[in-house]
Amino acid sequence: MPAEANQVIENIKLIPGGEELVNKAILSLNRSAEDAVKEATPIFKNAIRNMSIADAGKILFGPDSAATAYLRQTTYQELKTAFAPKVRASLDKPLVAGVSTNETWNTLSDAYNKVANTMVAKIAGLKPVNISLEEYATQKALDALFVKVAEEEKAIRTDPVARINEILKRVFGQLDKK
């Protein structure tokens, strides 16, 4: 959950059944990311197919994160566009009693913000929560995807066993000869 949601979450947990609701909402956020990540493969394949010889050379002989940086630069916006509807659909699935994670978040954050916007709450240091759960989940899914890509890239560059096909063996094998 977004850090901005901590005050809301802590108060929800005080309500009977609130902790279960929070846990289900977190699970729903995780599932939304899993649903969205499936969209990455064709987008990555397209970026690799459209790679120039110069780009390939920069990746091969560049820093350990060159491939990850290339994919982030060439696919990020397209991935974000592809992920957003998947994340939204997942967060719109019924969570408890036919109410979705998005509906629950919007209701709770609206109620919290009504309190947080009062003079007493401002004096007490409460701040309104203004974050889109969909945008947050989409961003976190993209962050996690590129962390995984970076881990795979590091393995391919440093461990010949991670080079699972002939192309990877032939291309990245050149690094072993240095």
Located regions from the model:
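A cross-kingdom marker for long, charged
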Residues: 134-178
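A contiguous pocket-lining binding segment that forms or flanks enzyme active sites
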Residues: 64-111
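Extended amphipathic ligand-handling, pore-lining, and cofactor/metal-binding catalytic surfaces
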Residues: 104, 111-127
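Hydrophobic alpha-helical segments of membrane proteins
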Residues: 82-90, 94, 115, 141-148, ...
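N-terminal Sec/ER secretory leader and immediately downstream segment
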Residues: 1-36
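Extracytoplasmic beta-rich ectodomain segments of secreted or membrane-anchored proteins
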Residues: 22-70
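Mature, extracytoplasmic segments of signal peptide-bearing proteins
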Residues: 127-130, 134
